[in-house]
């Protein structure tokens, strides 16, 4: 019995690491690794993609990709074998979620139809004007307009619209080109108008608006005027 006890003790002293020194492996999540490797990169979310080892990084108005294994960032679009731009689809989905929460009370309201149409527009944008002609002929929508001026001239026209005593009529005049060709505009000194424009620009930045027109209709985003697709959606 003593001999057996001595043998066991010898084994414990000879191989202590196998019994007491079990190594603990720390697993670092992709999120933690990204924050450590790229501390200056702000983001809203990091989520896995359908590609193993590749994660989508959403900044709030842009999407790029991160590979934790190689600790690198990739810029560009993911395209499926069917030619579908996966990156664009994801971006539109995230944009739709944000547009659904827009404060419509700060927008210019036109019409009283049952279907809500939200638009970011520039009054000098050709396709914005084409869209206005399309929507102004319908009685089944309510249009909520957020302004996104792409030039000083557009900004002046927007202020003229918001300063007007008859906002709807002035908006109609602008969209029908009656104030084009550098037509003189009355001065607008209303500070509330300036604040409204700043609010619209801030909201556009948060959503990721880069061009006009941009529409939100029945949960879908259209980054351009697509009359056939919009017509079909409104009929559904």
Task: For the regions a language model picked out, list residue spans one by one.
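Short, hinge-like loop/turn segments at secondary-structure boundaries
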Residues: 160-164
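Extended basic-aromatic, gly/pro-enriched interface segments that bind polyanionic ligands
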Residues: 179
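Bacterial N-terminal signal peptides
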Residues: 8-16
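Extracytoplasmic thiol/disulfide redox context detector
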Residues: 5, 19-159, 173-176, 184-212, ...
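Bacterial N-terminal signal peptides that target proteins for export
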Residues: 1-8
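Conserved, helical-rich catalytic subdomain that frames metal- and/or nucleotide-binding sites
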Residues: 165-172
């Amino acid at each position: 019995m003593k001999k057996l006890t001595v043998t066991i003790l010898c084994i414990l002293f000879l191989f202590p690491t196998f019994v007491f020194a079990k190594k603990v492996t720390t697993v670092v999540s992709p999120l933690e690794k990204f924050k450590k490797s790229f501390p200056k990169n702000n983001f809203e979310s990091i989520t896995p993609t359908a590609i193993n080892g590749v994660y989508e990084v959403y900044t709030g108005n842009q999407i790029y990709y991160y590979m934790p294994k190689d600790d690198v960032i990739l810029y560009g679009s993911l395209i499926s074998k069917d030619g579908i731009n996966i990156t664009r689809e994801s971006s539109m989905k995230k944009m739709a979620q944000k547009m659904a929460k827009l404060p419509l009370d700060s927008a210019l309201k036109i019409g009283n139809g049952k279907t809500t149409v939200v638009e970011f527009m520039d009054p000098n944008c050709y396709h914005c004007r084409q869209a206005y002609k399309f929507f102004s002929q319908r009685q089944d929508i309510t249009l909520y307009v957020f302004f996104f001026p792409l030039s000083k001239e557009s900004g002046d026209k927007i202020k003229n619209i918001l300063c007007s005593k008859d906002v709807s009529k002035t908006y109609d005049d602008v969209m029908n080109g009656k104030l084009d060709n550098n037509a003189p505009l009355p001065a607008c000194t209303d500070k509330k108008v300036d604040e409204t424009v700043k609010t619209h620009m801030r909201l556009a930045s948060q959503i990721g608006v880069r061009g006009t027109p941009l529409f939100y209709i029945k949960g879908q985003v259209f980054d351009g005027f697509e009359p056939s697709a919009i017509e079909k959606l409104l009929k559904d």
